[in-house]
Amino acid sequence: MVQRLKAIYLEKAAPRLREMFEYKNVHQIPRIEKIIINCGLGEASQNAKSLDSAMKELSIIAGQKGVITRAKKAIANFKLRKDMPVGISITLRGNSMYAFLDRLINLALPRIKDFQGVSSKGFDGHGNYNLGLKEQLMFPEINFDQIDQIRGMDISIVTTCNTDSEGFYLLETLGMPFKEKFTKN
């Protein structure tokens, strides 16, 4: 079964992008390569229980288990030693990537209070888009009564685009609710 967002990409986004940017080859058409979800946990070095609950919540949201990221070097001011857990990272590809992006665009983002759209300034210069979320409660899979702490997360959408304008039109065609139209910085 083809994911709904992948079908939209194949039927609408790819032909639109090919026409807009005049690609000669179908392999030049930009596509989403992967989505990386990262959650930094400063308190994880002192509290192992928070690491477990954050791992459980992110696994429910993403649909796959995450990898614990560890400190590369010791920082005395943060009471941090080398190889202590400092966060969780999940990389999504293929169908799970399209399923997560579909839930993010259509279910999670509209549940944010006073949501006007995401900023179009989150592009990195190479067509990849970065988005920060302040809480995990916007995802319908998370039960409010079962969380111990509100945590934010960073979501990076990595594309094969060469420019930010290609990335903007790719995500806009897939339904990403941007606040404003794309303008070069």
Curated annotation (Swiss-Prot):
GO biological process, alphabetically ordered: translation
InterPro entries: Ribosomal_uL5, Ribosomal_uL5_bac-type, Ribosomal_uL5_C, Ribosomal_uL5_CS, Ribosomal_uL5_dom_sf, Ribosomal_uL5_N
Signal peptide: none
Subcellular location: Plastid, Chloroplast
Purpose of the protein: Binds 5S rRNA, forms part of the central protuberance of the 50S subunit.
Family membership: Belongs to the universal ribosomal protein uL5 family.
Quaternary organization: Part of the 50S ribosomal subunit; contacts the 5S rRNA.
Protein name: Large ribosomal subunit protein uL5c
Gene source species: Chlorokybus atmophyticus (Soil alga)
Gene that specifies this protein: rpl5
